[in-house]
A protein has these predicted regions:
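Short alpha-helical elements of helix-turn-helix
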Residues: 4, 29-34, 136-139
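Conserved nucleic-acid-binding Ia/Ib motif block in the N-terminal RecA-like helicase ATPase lobe
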Residues: 43-113, 121-124, 167-171, 179-182
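Interdomain coupling/hinge region of P-loop NTPase helicase/AAA+ cores
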Residues: 51, 70, 79, 90, ...
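Residues at the beta-strand->loop junction immediately N-terminal to the Walker
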Residues: 17-21, 53-54, 159
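Nucleotide phosphate-binding site architecture
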Residues: 17, 35, 39, 60, ...
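Conserved pre-motif I regulatory segment
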Residues: 1-19
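Walker A/P-loop
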Residues: 14-34
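Short glycine-rich anion-binding loops that position phosphate/pyrophosphate groups of nucleotides
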Residues: 23, 106-108, 131-132
Length: 192
């Protein structure tokens, strides 16, 4: 809503490929669009509507902290699903109904395997730091998860680099994406 003027593509539901480093303001760029497009909907238990995949627990926490005030203001429930924390508590958050899930791939896959989460209602998927997920060996889980979300849904992928693995993701899962390059040092965004 606040940054709607800067987010025409993501708000319009276009697939987005963002090239940018951490801390270039992209969390709000994808997060506000996801929240704005999900606002007014209610998730059934275990069936989130929006998914943000990140490589690390630390990044999951940063994204959650950044988006929580905005999510509250539009009455959306966020669940954070990461390794190294109580899986029981995360399962109960999903059972209670969370519109948006911020997750690391391994733990999300564990919860799906346990029957605690389904992705077939997810219509907006964000991959943040996709190159880091590839470097950490998460590609098999990431593709398995992307294969479960709604095929006609919106996808936004952010990556500092576009190596072979990330390029494969872009080609396989993004449809006619609009490409943004973010240079945090200049604070400039170029659209191609």
């Amino acid at each position: 809503p606040i940054q709607a003027a800067t987010l025409p593509n993501s708000l319009a539901g276009r697939d987005v490929l963002g090239r940018g480093r951490t801390g270039s303001g992209k969390t709000l760029a994808f997060g506000l669009a996801l929240l704005a497009r999900t606002a007014g909907q209610r998730a059934e238990p275990r069936q989130p509507l929006g998914l943000i995949l990140v490589p690390t627990r630390e990044l999951a926490q940063q994204v959650t902290d950044a988006l929580t005030p905005y999510a509250r203001s539009v009455k959306l429930r966020l669940a954070t699903v990461v390794g190294g924390m109580s899986i029981g508590r995360q399962a109960s958050a999903l059972r209670g109904g969370a519109e948006v899930v911020v997750a690391t791939p391994g733990r999300l896959k564990d919860l799906i395997d346990r029957g605690e989460c389904r992705l077939d209602q997810v219509s907006i998927t964000v991959l943040d730091e996709a190159d880091q997920m590839a470097d950490m060996g998460f590609m098999p889980q990431v593709t398995a998860l992307l294969d479960q979300v709604r095929p006609e849904g919106q996808r936004m992928l952010f990556s500092a680099t576009l190596d072979r693995n990330v390029d494969l993701l872009v080609r396989r899962y993004l449809t006619d994406p609009v490409v943004h390059s973010v240079d945090p040092s200049a604070g400039a965004v170029t659209t191609m």
